[in-house]
Design a protein with these regions (language model features):
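TPR repeat positional signature
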Residues: 10, 44-47, 87
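Alpha-helical adaptor scaffolds
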Residues: 40-80
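Residues in the short coil linking paired helices within alpha-helical repeat scaffolds
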Residues: 22, 56-59, 99
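Conserved small-residue packing positions in alpha-helical repeats and bundles
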Residues: 14, 48-51, 84, 91
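Flexible helix-coil transition and linker loops at the boundaries of alpha-helical arrays
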Residues: 1, 33-40, 71-80, 116-120
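Alpha-helical segment of the N-proximal tetratricopeptide repeat
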Residues: 8-25
Length: 132
């Protein structure tokens, strides 16, 4: 990740603001990152961070889907290490919205890349026994 990239710098500033409990300031940094993105890599990063501070679960899901869409449009390995996080966020979005089948799908995609997550609202027996 190129920390000299303006989109990444804005996302780092947004993260700093988040840790300082300044959510509106953080959201503004992430929104600015989205507005200045020039390629799919930058769009993926900005959308991922924008998803974190949405006011509704539906909006969070949409931004997470946008991030994944742009990740898939990147034609190199630059987002590969980022995919587990995108999958986990999508899993959590679907779980929050009560769509356990979709949640399980994305949690399993993350697990296939080495990141295991325990779903909070999906009974473990259902999670293990459902087929992909």
């Amino acid at each position: 990740m190129d920390i000299g990239n303006p989109v990444i710098q804005l996302c780092l500033e947004g993260t700093r603001a988040e840790f300082e409990h300044k959510k509106e300031e953080a959201r503004a940094f992430y929104q600015q990152a989205w507005e200045i993105h020039i390629d799919d890599y930058e769009a993926c990063i900005a959308a991922h961070y924008l998803a974190r501070l949405q006011k509704t679960a539906e909006d969070t899901l949409q931004w997470n889907l946008t991030a994944l869409e742009h990740a898939f449009a990147v034609n190199d390995e630059s987002v590969e290490s980022f995919l587990p996080s995108l999958y986990l966020n999508l899993g959590h979005s679907y779980e929050t919205l009560g769509n356990n089948a979709e949640a399980k799908k994305y949690y399993q995609l993350a697990a296939a890349l080495g990141v295991i997550h325990q779903a909070t609202n999906i009974p473990q027996s259902n999670f293990e026994n459902q087929k992909s």
